[in-house]
UniProtKB/Swiss-Prot annotation:
Example of a GO biological process term: regulation of cytosolic calcium ion concentration
Keyword Coiled coil found: no
Family membership: Belongs to the calcitonin family.
Intrachain S-S bonds: 81-86
Residue numbers covered by the propeptide annotation in the UniProt entry: 26-79
Compartments it resides in: Secreted
Domain of life per record: Eukaryota
Record's GO cellular component terms: extracellular space
Name of the protein described by the UniProt record: Calcitonin receptor-stimulating peptide 2
Amino acid sequence: MGFWKFPPFLVLSILVLYQAGMFHTAPVRLPLESSFDSATLTEEEVSLLLVAMVKDYVQMKATVLEQESEDFSITAQEKSCNTASCVTHKMTGWLSRSGSVAKNNFMPTNVDSKILG
């Protein structure tokens, strides 16, 4: 998923740098090209393309955030359990954790049956 986040930034930065005037270099002509001129974008077309890309990026981010919020609400619903089996499972976990603490802290070490009576 991380791969899809990089290309929009790359294209957006190239268009911004083009708008700023950083990429005004001479075009490379191959010997096979005859009189065919490559299509160039006018200032208005570049601006429209930039706006469309930003709009698409914002829509993509909104979709991703919406999916993450749906995943979070599903996780929250799974964590809140009201059924008897779920509550029993939670209580078993609490008792097993507190049992190990009680064993370590409160159990006498040298106790015989003769001492207790």
